[in-house]
Amino acid sequence: MKQVVVLSLILSFFLFFSCDKKTKIEKAVEAIPVQIKVNRFDKAFFETAPQDLPKLKQEYPFFFPAGNDDSVWLEKMQHPQWRELYTEVEKLYANFDGKTAEIEALFKHIKYYFPETKTPKVYTVISEMDYHNKVIYTKEMLIISLELYLGSKHRFYDFPAYITQNFESNQILPDIASSFATTKVTPPNDLTFLAQMIYVGKELYLKDQLLPETSDADKIGYTKEQLMWCQENEGYIWRYFIENKMLYDSDQKLIPRFINPAPFSKFYLEIDNETPGRIGTWIGWQIARSFMENNKVSLNDFLKMDAKEIFEKSKYKPKK
């Protein structure tokens, strides 16, 4: 009985210490001055009269690349399908204040961990539905393509379900964090499956720090059911990777099977259709988390570390 009490006290102490540490971080984050102004280029473009196009081009020169005749932009401004798309965007995003506040909170977290980061100019656009570039982040600019956040079932989308499931409004923030993360996590020269898993795992661990209020499902872009499947089958997945000697395998076919976006992961077993895509990404995330739980290393140092060292010091051991 005494042992139970002692263990409970120890557990309570660590939980208190962990929560207290998080509270201190969040208080420090809140105190960081960040002011985001979202420039609604989508509104400006579709609400500008054709005769005022020259003024718009002066205000937003970077959205009008040289070589395109004005007739291209005038056609887009007035085309019924483009205008219908703008109407659909306006139904959801006429007021962007809520998202602006969320973006400010994200950049406060970014500046807490990376103080040298400049606050970018933020622009919303309606583009060509390039789902590979839903968000574009540079040191100076952040561009959000709102036509790709109309809801997974929107009638305008003609893409596979595993892609459109992340066309929801709640994916805007995780997508911004992902775009930022690619500037802080360097792709490894090591081509092993383990190194590739930990590379994407680092990005997700960074999202843990930048988006503390965001669910794990939203951070990785899974449904709740897909996340639950990973959690319930973590031991099985890991055993499969070990038994098939995949960790130090440099076969690049493992990347599309287990890391790249896909409708399901390819174990080449009966369970494949039950699985979400990117199982290897999820495992890499758990290894990253395990390492940071078991080692006193700064976030910046962790992001620069070698995958093999991270794995060996992670003490990663999934539940059976």
Cite the ranges covered by each PLM segment.
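C-terminal soluble interaction/assembly domains
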Residues: 251-320
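Acidic/His-rich structured neighborhood in mature extracellular/periplasmic domains
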Residues: 82-230, 300, 304-307
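C-terminal motif of bacterial Sec signal peptides marking the signal peptidase cleavage site
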Residues: 15-18
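Sec-dependent signal peptide recognition
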Residues: 2-10
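N-terminal mature-domain "stem" immediately C-terminal to a signal peptide or N-terminal signal-anchor/transmembrane
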Residues: 20-85
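Extracytoplasmic/secreted envelope proteins and their assembly/folding machinery
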Residues: 38, 104-107, 203, 207, ...
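Acidic/His/Gly-enriched intrinsically disordered linker/tail segments
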Residues: 205-267
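Sec-exported extracytoplasmic/periplasmic mature domains
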Residues: 46, 61, 65, 111-115, ...
